[in-house]
Amino acid sequence: MLTPTQQVGLILQYLKTRILDIYTPEQRAGIEKSEDWRQFSRRMDTHFPKLMNELDSVYGNNEALLPMLEMLLAQAWQSYSQRSASLKNIDIERENNPDWILSNKQVGGVCYVDLFAGDLKGLKDKIHYFQELGLTYLHLMPLFKCPEGKSDGGYAVSSYRDVNPALGTIGDLREVIAALHEAGISAVVDFIFNHTSNEHEWAQRCAAGDPLFDNFYYIFPDRRMPDQYDRTLREIFPDQHPGGFSQLEDGRWVWTTFNSFQWDLNYSNPWVFRAMAGEMMFLANLGVDILRMDAVAFIWKQMGTSCENLPQAHALIRAFNAVMRIAAPAVFFKSEAIVHPDQVVQYIGQDECQIGYNPLQMALLWNTLATREVNLLHQALTYRHNLPEHTAWVNYVRSHDDIGWTFADEDAAYLGISGYDHRQFLNRFFVNRFDGSFARGVPFQYNPNTGDCRVSGTSAALAGLAQNDPHAVSRIKLLYSIALSTGGLPLIYLGDEVGTPNDDGWVQDSNKSDDSRWAHRPRYNEALYAQRNDPSTAAGQIYQGLRHMIAVRQSNPRFDGGRLVTFNTNNKHIIGYIRNNALLAFGNFSEYPQTVTAHTLQAMPFKAHDLIGGKTVSLNQDLTLQPYQVMWLEIA
């Protein structure tokens, strides 16, 4: 009797044979001698067992698994053989250096193409600015074809192979990516794989009863099954879309976790996996370096559960990862999981998503500004920051999305804080419903049944710049100093670097007025960017401060990697941590001067050089930080 390993080996050899069966003997002989086949075959030998094991754990009893694999790997070979020589070189470079993303040189930016540059041709003209800022990674927010009007900001995709016509063409995107690569900038796009728009060809053909697309989505004849599922589902957008299902014109019901125009894909059908892997390979061959894996928590459904963070979801992502290791190993995955911190980290791994958003740190940065106390942030950095090797956090301050207060209730309780009550405070503080608040945020998706609410707003609005608070600029620089120095890949939400305010016009737009997140999705502010080199302006102070910190980070290997050790400052207002046993970082979250005592610093060297201030400071005496001051001290 064959062992499982032997069985997988036989399947692998069978599939390799089937890939080559379409060729004539002469063609086959040539292919088998080629460098392309040698590399592809080597990668299949390494990664097919992982792919097979993950898919078997999901589809093991499905008779379609083997024929699906046969078609998938034939497609993977075609995709790899058509991959450009330059991309194949990057494949090899990143196989040999999986820590490329952890370099101190890496600094990211993210923007909507239309809002920042008008279209793809306009974005290409902005590359010189991205280089000026120091970016090595650029995330282009959803730019694929989507419904006109409401499209969840582009997250309802009607075609993964067509760019939104208002932005340009696939050819334009290919040119932009090539130009970014020429400038030393990696290209990042969203891979929205939990759902498509209701206008996607697959959705239209599934709804029409096309047998080739049968069961591509969850469509039910009546409410019996949806009612059973809804009992345990969380409402994501309760204001505009209560429940998890939407009714079609013919009376049937379709699963729509997010919005009625976003239909959830049915991954219990293995052909859906194969179809989405094909879209992934298409994007990889455009030159995309990183895929932001959208809504990873939701892709598997199971009756009686929350349909979030299920084991099959992880297995499917690892299977997608294995496909990329075979067909386009240069491509990395970035997880987007805004869930409990215990679950966020489970999506990050070399075989799953190599990098992932750090929503806990983001939320706690704003929490610490509001409370002026670093206890929750210190706790998170101590116990939840360090990741497995070859993986990294994406550390951000703001994004296109709302702020959810994602700290764990049990973490808060350990510090004597009621999670529920503290979230209520934070919501009131950041929407200016709390005495003494400097913030001017906007509430998002208040749920009266649970009391849950999130917050919208740009960094400038939330930090107090809108009302010219004298500390607003320093607050913004402080938050970005943490993102730049805690380890991992820092990400700038473009516009933040010049203090762009909220766009109050969202309430007058019928396609946006029910979604306050549009408040922090403003257009490129030409006047503010024109001020970026003028230190007499807030825009200039923020920009020059961030640009200086980026330059320091990129010139100093002490910022390499992703791990840190927290340093107890014995001052509830000052956060402290050590990077690579060589850099001691301090940040004062108070509007008053704060001190780290000489006694607290007694294990440190007598003197240290402050990389931000450019001065030598004494550590054998009390060290005072001015309001919202940051210090990056070389201690070795």
UniProtKB/Swiss-Prot annotation:
EC number: 2.4.1.4
Primary enzyme class: transferase
Any GO BP: carbohydrate metabolic process
Disulfide bridge positions per record: none
Catalysed conversion reaction: [(1->4)-alpha-D-glucosyl](n) + sucrose = [(1->4)-alpha-D-glucosyl](n+1) + D-fructose
Keyword Isomerase: no
Sites marked Transition state stabilizer: 452
Cellular component terms per the entry's GO annotation: extracellular region
Active site, UniProt feature: 294, 336
Family named by the database record: Belongs to the glycosyl hydrolase 13 family.
Protein's job: Catalyzes the synthesis of alpha-glucan from sucrose. Catalyzes, in addition, sucrose hydrolysis, maltose and maltotriose synthesis by successive transfers of the glucosyl moiety of sucrose onto the released glucose, and finally turanose and trehalulose synthesis, these two sucrose isomers being obtained by glucosyl transfer onto fructose.
PANTHER family noted in UniProt: ALPHA AMYLASE CATALYTIC REGION, ALPHA-AMYLASE FAMILY MEMBER
Descriptive protein name: Amylosucrase
Organism field: Neisseria meningitidis
